[in-house]
């Protein structure tokens, strides 16, 4: 019985995470390639995963990435006004984590550790640290 409940919970968590991520991808106007790479998926998997009837599983790394991206999105929306909140991730940035690169490219290249670093960086900006 517990295994059934855990499976249902896992499926719900995956569905919610993918729905939120799809909305963020749209808000940020990311390409299919960028969205897939940021989530550490192949383009074909992302095409399937963004559909409401997706029944696949995500790895722990992928779920953590999606969670961190939601946090990044939230911080950007709270810290900046539009259009900067929606375009910050795709603009070249001279901040300490980026060295002139786009935060998106930095996140894709650096994987989960860099995505988490970006989230921490934005949370610190928002908190005034």
Language model regions located:
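Non-transmembrane "mature" sequence context
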Residues: 1-129
């Amino acid at each position: 019985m517990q295994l059934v409940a855990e499976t249902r919970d896992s499926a719900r968590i995956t569905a919610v995470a993918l729905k939120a991520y799809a909305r963020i991808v749209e808000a940020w106007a990311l390409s299919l390639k960028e969205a897939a790479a940021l989530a550490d998926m192949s383009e074909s998997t992302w095409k399937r995963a963004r559909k409401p009837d997706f029944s696949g599983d995500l790895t722990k790394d992928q779920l953590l990435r999606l969670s961190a991206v939601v946090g990044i999105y939230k911080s950007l929306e709270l810290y900046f006004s539009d259009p900067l909140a929606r375009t910050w991730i795709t603009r070249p940035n001279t901040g300490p984590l980026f060295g002139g690169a786009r935060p998106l490219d930095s996140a894709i290249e650096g994987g989960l550790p860099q995505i988490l670093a970006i989230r921490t960086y934005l949370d610190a900006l928002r908190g005034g640290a």
